Amino acid sequence: MPNLDKLIIGFDHALRTLLTPAQTLRPVPGTQLPEAELNDLEKSESAALMRVNHVGEICAQALYQGQALTARNAEVQQTLAQAAREETEHLAWTERRINELSGRKSLLNPLWYGGSFAIGAFAGLLGDKWNLGFLAETERQVSAHLGGHLSRLPHADEKSRAIVTQMQIDEAGHATTAVAYGGAELPMPVKLVMRMASSVMTRTAYWV
């Protein structure tokens, strides 16, 4: 069971994720590219898609924190912590791009975080192989979702496309790492439920 220190650290992480700008150690992908001259419709579409991606990173932070809270193996905890650090960079990249596009973040971010944290904590309680399997499947689905966004983003919006492309590469790496550390293949019904939940989140975050 998680101790009080872990709970306090988790609460602090939640506040920082939701209330303070995320920081990145790596350069933001696409920084060197010129800003495209997008029309209002294209700009709105890019901002909405990047908002969805930002929500995805909010959820990823919460999932990893929940999983790490209940994970039983120190090595698994370290794997989750490393993935969370890279997701923090994704959070910073998407937030910066939303601001550049004069967009806004989702109004439901606290809800997304709370729900994802609970799911992650439950996954951790199932044992490390299922915990890592859940991580791997989550990253596979996120990678596929990012691929869909690459097909929807305006072709001229090279800055957003560069960010999403690098995020997709990172997510694939997280999935591979989780499997290498012993992640189990999830049953198909679980995968389908995850896809349905993801669909609700992405459709809602596009607008709200």
UniProtKB/Swiss-Prot annotation:
Keyword terms = Cell membrane, Iron, Membrane, Metal-binding, Monooxygenase, Oxidoreductase, Ubiquinone biosynthesis
Name the InterPro entries for this protein: COQ7_proteobact, Ferritin-like, Ferritin-like_SF, Ubq_synth_Coq7
- Tell me the cofactor note: Binds 2 iron ions per subunit.
Ligand binding (Fe cation 1):
57, 87, 90, 171
Per the record, membrane topology reads: Peripheral membrane protein
Task: Tell me yes or no: is Acetylation among this UniProt entry's keywords.
Answer: no
Known catalytic reactions: a 5-methoxy-2-methyl-3-(all-trans-polyprenyl)benzene-1,4-diol + AH2 + O2 = a 3-demethylubiquinol + A + H2O
Residues annotated to bind Fe cation 2: 87, 139, 171, 174
The metabolic or biological pathway listed in the UniProt record of this protein is: Cofactor biosynthesis; ubiquinone biosynthesis
The Swiss-Prot or TrEMBL record describes its family as follows: Belongs to the COQ7 family.
Describe the function of this protein.
Catalyzes the hydroxylation of 2-nonaprenyl-3-methyl-6-methoxy-1,4-benzoquinol during ubiquinone biosynthesis.
Q: What's the protein here called?
A: 3-demethoxyubiquinol 3-hydroxylase
Q: What's the gene?
A: coq7
